[in-house]
Amino acid sequence: MLQGHSSVFQALLGTFFTWGMTAAGAALVFVFSSGQRRILDGSLGFAAGVMLAASYWSLLAPAVEMATSSGGFGAFAFFPVAVGFTLGAAFVYLADLLMPHLGAAEDPQTTLALNFGSTLMKKKSDPEGPALLFPESELSIRIGRAGLLSDKSENGEAYQRKKAAATGLPEGPAVPVPSRGNLAQPGGSSWRRIALLILAITIHNVPEGLAVGVGFGAIEKTASATFESARNLAIGIGIQNFPEGLAVSLPLRGAGFSTWRAFWYGQLSGMVEPLAGVFGAFAVVLAEPILPYALAFAAGAMVYVVMDDIIPEAQISGNGKLASWASILGFVVMMSLDVGLG
């Protein structure tokens, strides 16, 4: 991120940095084993705190200032921010609802069943990748946002998420994964898994890239929308992408993927961010009136992801207190970064 260049170029540099941090986090799969849940849960908690702080200081605060200073909304200056924030959350929610209709529910091999430290998980040899049997106490891994999509723990008791239930998987003892038509053929199954994998990754990593792009596109539009603010946002998202890369690659390694393949899919989760960042910067440069909506949209998407995905995932293995304090630490670090360097 070099001051003095165009907003679009800055957004490209910023999102390349966030992608690189994702890859660096995914590379830890070469160091840690899949059973080290405390590290993963603490990292996810830290990422949640960073995202919440970045959502306010780098996105919502400039959006509110723009809506207020424009004078066009008067006492209703909150309206564009509220609309954008709600639309951002709705975007991620609807994307999650759409996934089963795009075929994710038809091919259970896109959802990897994991049971850390358990012998209940059985693997079936497959030249294209591991086909798994679903154990009774499973952790369903969604590739993309924070890796895990699972039975959550609430006060120590497991409960089934609606998203996991949407796949139609019954509770009970391990049963073989059924094959459907041409999915039994290795070639077709492999391409289908890859296509759905890329789709899931794209949907769930757009908000971060969009936030960085919109942040750089908004530079000098208000007093709080500065280069330093946009740079700090990119650094903050890069920091929280580090554990996210690990959260994708580590479960994949535990599911039977090779270390290099787990690393590849882990870093792939950040590859879409440069595209989303450039799009966000272009959009706000060409259409300045949408800036408050765009900033709030990115914030809403990020906050929804934290509440719906990252925080619940950090609570599933009995490390809830660790994850909570890590969240506080992440929030303080990002707040200090934004205020101290802004």
Swiss-Prot record:
It catalyses: Zn(2+)(in) = Zn(2+)(out); Cu(2+)(in) = Cu(2+)(out). The chain crosses the membrane at residues 12-32, 44-64, 72-92, 194-214, 263-285, 290-307, 322-342. One of its GO terms (molecular function) is zinc ion transmembrane transporter activity. GO terms for biological process: zinc ion import across plasma membrane; zinc ion transmembrane transport. Zinc importer that regulates cytosolic zinc concentrations either via zinc influx from the extracellular compartment or efflux from intracellular organelles such as Golgi apparatus. May transport copper ions as well. The transport mechanism remains to be elucidated. Belongs to the ZIP transporter (TC 2.A.5) family. This is Zinc transporter ZIP11. The gene is SLC39A11.
